[in-house]
Amino acid sequence: VHSHIDHLFALMQMAKDRGLERVYIHAFLDGRDVSPTSGVDYVTRTVEKCRELGVGKIATLMGRYYAMDRDKRWDRVEAAYDAMVYGESAHVNPLPVAAVKDAYAAGVTDEFIEPVICDGDGTISDNDSVIFFNYRPDRAREITRTLVDPKFDGFTRQYFPVTFVCTTEYDLSLIHI
């Protein structure tokens, strides 16, 4: 409904074909439109594809409850933003698959996994490029706005120019993408 893992793999292949070396993935786990514990399979497949291609690392992972809010619950969105931009979270695990399994062991399903830092070098920073391949605008607007809108005021954050590409129009007011 929101995206497909084959699109991620095609983007990773494109990055490899273009010789990109610093490719980081910020994984948003679903748990609503698919099984609430299917995230471990997607994360496993992604880690395997990174190894196979020799490109890409999972920098962060989190449930859609944080990254894909649509009701201006800025505390949730800020937690996602802080993980992706500042590399800050109460949860750090360099092994993405283990991070998901740890959440399951604690009774937390994909949708509600709090942001986890898997690779602190993968933060989004000045002049980075971001490809957001979510196809449902309603769940993508808020996190997008935090990254591209200089007038965003939902919480205090550092604004910096990011080249941001998305796969559909999220909002006519988001003129920076």
Where are these regions (language model features)?
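Structural beta-sheet core signal
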Residues: 25-27, 132, 164-166
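Glycine-rich, histidine-containing beta strand-loop boundary motifs that form or position
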Residues: 27-29, 62, 168
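Active-site histidine-anchored catalytic micro-motif
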Residues: 1-45
